[in-house]
């Protein structure tokens, strides 16, 4: 049988094909690096808010529980942004006679002017969302915190932040890594909002973190799924 030979005019195309292949590899590598770069994933994103609210003071120094402001986190898919009324509980403005209806913590502070304006007009403060997942991603706060996933697992040490920033990458790979091995991220439910609580200095029921997590996962049937429909509904 006679062998098939490519015509000579094909030879230059081999070089073009090689260059195109190399360019494709470089492009794929560059895109892979770009989409996994912390800047692309918004790690460190720290927007200026209309009110300079300090979590370091409120959650850190004053030890306010996360649920005082984000009061739906254990019951709902979304952690509520606190209404102005929550702020007014402590920062009640003074009336014309200088009398405050509730607690008078810095009632005339210029930094709290947007809060007082919001209270008087009934218009919500225009907070800027920091942890902003894509619209095609479903995330349920209640499911996670009720299972024993602490706020700091996803948000970092909020209680040490003067201005809140995105501390974790919140990428699909990052989420899946936890779903595949949730044990190291679990703690007793009563310590979920205690951001300074740590297994390194604590034991629960005489067990270390690894032993407790294994028992907890069996008792509460924690077996996170990783198929697409779990988060993309």
Give names to the regions the model predicted:
Residues 58, 92-93, 142:
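Beta-hairpin (beta-strand-turn-beta-strand) motif
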Residues 63-72, 84-94, 150-157, 174-181, ...:
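The canonical Cys-X-X-Cys-His
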Residues 98-138, 145-149, 169-176, 180-233:
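Flexible coil segments in periplasmic/lumen-exposed cytochrome c-class electron-transfer proteins
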């Amino acid at each position: 049988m006679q062998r098939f030979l490519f015509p000579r005019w094909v030879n230059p195309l081999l070089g073009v094909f090689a260059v195109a292949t190399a360019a494709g590899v470089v492009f794929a590598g560059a895109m892979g690096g770009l989409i996994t770069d912390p800047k692309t994933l918004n790690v460190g994103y720290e927007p200026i808010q209309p009110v300079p609210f300090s979590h370091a003071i409120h959650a850190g120094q004053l030890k306010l529980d996360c649920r005082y402001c984000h009061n739906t986190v254990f019951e709902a898919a979304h952690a509520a942004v606190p209404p102005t009324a929550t702020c007014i509980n402590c920062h009640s403005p003074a009336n014309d006679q200088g009398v405050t209806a509730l607690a008078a913590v810095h009632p005339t502070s210029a930094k709290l002017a947007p809060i007082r304006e919001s209270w008087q007009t009934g218009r919500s403060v225009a907070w800027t969302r920091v942890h902003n997942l894509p619209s095609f991603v479903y995330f349920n706060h209640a499911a996670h915190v009720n299972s024993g996933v602490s706020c700091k697992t996803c948000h970092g040490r909020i209680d040490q932040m003067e201005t809140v920033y995105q501390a974790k990458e919140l990428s699909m790979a990052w989420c899946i890594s936890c779903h595949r091995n949730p044990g190291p991220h679990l703690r007793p439910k009563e310590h979920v909002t205690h951001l300074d609580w740590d297994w390194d200095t604590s034991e629960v029921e005489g067990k270390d973190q690894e032993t407790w997590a294994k028992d907890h996962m069996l008792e509460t049937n924690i077996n996170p799924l990783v198929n697409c429909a779990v988060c993309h509904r």
